[in-house]
Amino acid sequence: GNRFVIIIDEWDVLIRDEAANKIVQEEYINFLRGLFKGTEPTRYIALAYLTGILPIKKYKTQSALNNFLEYTMLNPGKMAPYIGFTEAEVQAVCAAYQKDFQEVKRWYDGYLLGNYHVYNPCAVVNLIFQGTFQSYWSQTGTYESIVPLINMNFDGLKTDIVTMLSGDAVAVRTTTYQNDMVTFKNKNDVLTALIHLG
């Protein structure tokens, strides 16, 4: 028979917005697990496509989902050119809307995923519609959630952030991050969260 295609945009909104509410988070993860985990769902679901900022949350040692491919800022795989606008796409937009590509690059070239320079689509689209260069990302809820992270008192965190803001690279160990917005044991966990938040 017919099977469904399920699309969940911002799957992680409860993980981010209810960061301190473990009960809501666990109920939500259990809901996702019941919806997608195991072989039974393949009888009625052809494809599930979930978007979000954070990787899929794990409880204990088990992921909420199995039989899925996960692409993240840390491991974009073949999806790297689809996570944002590529440089070629931004050049085409700049040509179509008479924007200085070098200035757009200076403002919005935020990611290097594999071999791709990837731009934040929200920022580029806002530039086209608003007509002015500014930090559109700082007007989002995500921006508000990073301020407490930056202010955490982990040894060397603020120094590393200043180093990155000046254009230099900082090594980050990403293996201990718990894929949530409350479990931070060291500066590497905070920096990993910041990577996922963009």
Residue ranges of predicted features:
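Phosphate-binding site recognition
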Residues: G1-G198
